[in-house]
Amino acid sequence: MVKLADGSEKGLKGHFKEDFSHRTRIGLAPRAGHVDRDAPFKRIATEEAWTFPALVKAQVDYFESGAAKADDSLKMGAMFSKMPSLQEMLQDLGELRIAHMDELGIDRQLLLLTAPGVQVVKPGDGTALAREANDIAADACARHPDRFSALAAFDPRDVAGSVTELERAAKLGLNGAVLNSHWQGHYIDEQDYWPILEALEANDLALYIHPTAPFNGAHYETRGFFGALGGFPHDVWLHTMGIIFSGAFDRFPKLRLVIGHMGECMPLQLYRFDWMQGNADNRAGLRGGQPPVKLQHPVSYYFHNNIWITTSGVAWEPAIKFCMDVLGPERVLYAMDYPYQQSYDEVAAYDRMDIAPDLKKMLMEDNARRVFNLPA
């Protein structure tokens, strides 16, 4: 337990009161271990969530208005709003968060505005909330420059406002941008939103696509799979493949895309993606009636040149080694997924992994610095 300035103890063990936080060690979960406090690298965690009260209220108000009944991401946001200790951790960008980082051995967090983000509030309100979020994040980074970096929020429904806000975020010194996947069933591969991709490339900002619950996903909800067990990876998979097959990377070849949770399983399918692309090029109908597509490169090329993945929530040595092998060790970044998934034993598991020291330093520190232009 860590003592805060007011004398209270707010260690991770026992901090959560909500039932969803009580987990049993089963299956592949890492065994108990000890974190190396003298590791020859900094631990930079690159998918670490936060939020702020005005956004939580705006999400709940929009949910309760009934204006977007088919959007399970709003249901998810409303559910999280009723978890006080989760909200305490999400909304703290100071003493409590840093105490938890110290307890876990994390040197720096990359802050991402948590799902469902600013794109699921009342239309017209998202850009102002994004601006407020980015000011809060920039202030936290200024107050704790050795501990926090942050990605910018934007509301893709307001394309012109998003472009302006991304330009402002770059001037604020933010280190990229985060999009919590779809907004009422729309995705950034649709060409109406390409000015946002152009702005990201022009301002040298990597885009992190973070999961949210799928749109109109009753079949996920009834089975209890709209989150990490199904809906999250499926939605980011759809979003990422849409960006690739739209030709966006051919149009914006310097665009950088980051996806979490070990690439949402996509690295395992690179062979099949290339094989199916070879059958779909210039042939209408093979992709569910879509028009013919001719990309400049195989799908795997974009994973090797435009896409990076993080290990958020997957502290599993075989998967990490596989992804480092098929994508390249420079394309895999460490992440924890605080506060949703946090584990001292997972951090210790990274220390134990049988990975060459230079490659482990790339995983834990160097790759994050390069992709997100973090300070040395």
Q: Predicted segment positions?
A:
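Generic detector of well-ordered alpha-helical packing
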Residues: E48-A49, P211, M262, Y338
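A short acidic, helix-capping loop that chelates divalent metal ions and anchors anionic groups
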Residues: G117-K122
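Short coil-to-beta-strand
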Residues: E103-L111, I209, F215-N216
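Charged helix-capping and loop-helix junction motifs
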Residues: G126-N134, D189-P195
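Catalytic pocket-lining loop regions of alpha/beta-barrel enzymes
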Residues: R168-L327, R331
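Short loop/turn segments at strand-loop or loop-helix junctions that form parts
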Residues: L112-P116
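Mid-to-C-terminal alpha-helical segments outside catalytic/metal-binding sites
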Residues: V2-I44, T51-R108, D135-R143, T164-R168, ...
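Short glycine-enriched loops at secondary-structure junctions
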Residues: P156, P211-F215, Y338-Y340
